[in-house]
């Protein structure tokens, strides 16, 4: 479970994220949806411990900054960061050792295969394209057998085959009872994945939707319902 309580992030006098609270339960895919600049990545980086913030973040009932929480928390950043001198496989093996993961050698072998990196395993971090680095980041996040997974704009830079594979991975994690949070502005890419959706605008969550409660409305209809002005000039709050 991932729980965010009154998360606020300021840069000087500018409020980037304003008292945001939400929860994603075990076995759910949560979508943090909004235009560029809405505050999605700031929330993601705060949850990941990359930014200082006010408020609270809980991972399976533990404080997000605790070592216990970090051991079960997989994170795929918007901009992947690689070790220049490590190969693709060495990245995965490094994560295994750093997290003391129980991932098997067979599972390590399978990860590059799933994301078409099998013939790239000996390439160094500084030899990888943006798309390949994104795939390695996903493999590393999966290598710890996470209970909570957070992905920031994960489909950007991926080829169609990798996007399809990533969607399958997300659904597999959901079936295993994992908590997944995806930050994106690409509605089409997540329309078949989500269980709960949080629509952001100007640093605030302006609407929350549960897929079980919205009848036959699709994700685009819901999003534009709350982000586009009403007829007659009125706007949704």
Segments from the language model and where they lie:
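Catalytic Walker B motif of ABC-type/P-loop ATPase nucleotide-binding domains
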Residues: 149-153
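Conserved ABC ATPase signature
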Residues: 124-131
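Conserved ABC transporter NBD signature motif
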Residues: 55-69
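Helix-to-loop junction immediately C-terminal to a conserved catalytic motif
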Residues: 48
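Conserved ABC ATPase "signature" region
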Residues: 93, 103-120
